[in-house]
Amino acid sequence: MGLTEAEAIEKYGKSEIKTYNSTFVNLWYGTFSDMEPSDKPKTRMKMICQGEEERVVGLHVVGMAADEMLQGFGVAVKMGATKAHFDDCVALHPTAAEEFVTMAPWGMSKRVY
């Protein structure tokens, strides 16, 4: 949802864009002990931020329940949430969505509330 990385660079310029990425196996697949780890589908997430305040202009997920994750975060993005806002949230564990609020470098934003 929001801008892709390419769209954000085109709109704001490369120097204004910072991306955060994560790839992991969804915890749901932990119950499948008969599957090889390499066979378990990966979830990929990307957060695209703009400017010094790192306003979130794009969130992207490929993986299980991506639609459910993005629905809630959509409100935050529309309201102008920053990476620091995401960093300041308590992660609901165990969920895949928690990755957005613990995305490395977690807590390293210039301004955590």
Which residues make up each language-model segment?
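Flexible, glycine-rich terminal cap/loop adjacent to redox cofactors
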Residues: 1-4, 9-113
